[in-house]
């Protein structure tokens, strides 16, 4: 649980989900019920913390979910998006994703 209030999945490189926002695709580094961290990629328009973003999250197990949230933080190598209430990932979906990853990557923790 990493001392957090919610369970977080840190993805193995070969199973990272993808976020699509318009014509741009980003790799997901980790996710929880309330947020996702994506690998940074330069955009033609600079984004600032607090910016509303929306798109599609394709989980490793194949489920695709639309999302809306706000850019919480920009780091040198990643962005953190806080998901809006209706876009949050239900805990059963997080557990299903975890089971999927464990079945495909037995050494993954």
Predicted regions and their residues:
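N-terminal helix initiation/capping motif
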Residues: 1-33, 39-44, 95-109
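Surface-exposed connector loops and short turns at secondary-structure junctions
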Residues: 43-51
């Amino acid at each position: 649980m990493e001392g957090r209030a919610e369970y977080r999945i840190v993805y193995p490189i070969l199973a990272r989900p993808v976020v699509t926002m318009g014509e741009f695709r980003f790799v997901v580094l980790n996710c929880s019920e309330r947020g996702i961290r994506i690998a940074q990629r330069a955009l033609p328009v600079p984004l600032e913390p607090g910016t509303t973003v929306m798109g599609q999250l394709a989980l490793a197990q194949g489920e695709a979910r639309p999302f809306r949230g706000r850019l919480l933080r920009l780091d040198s190598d990643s962005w953190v998006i806080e998901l809006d209430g209706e876009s949050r990932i239900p805990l059963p979906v997080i557990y299903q994703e975890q089971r999927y990853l464990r079945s495909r990557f037995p050494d993954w923790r």
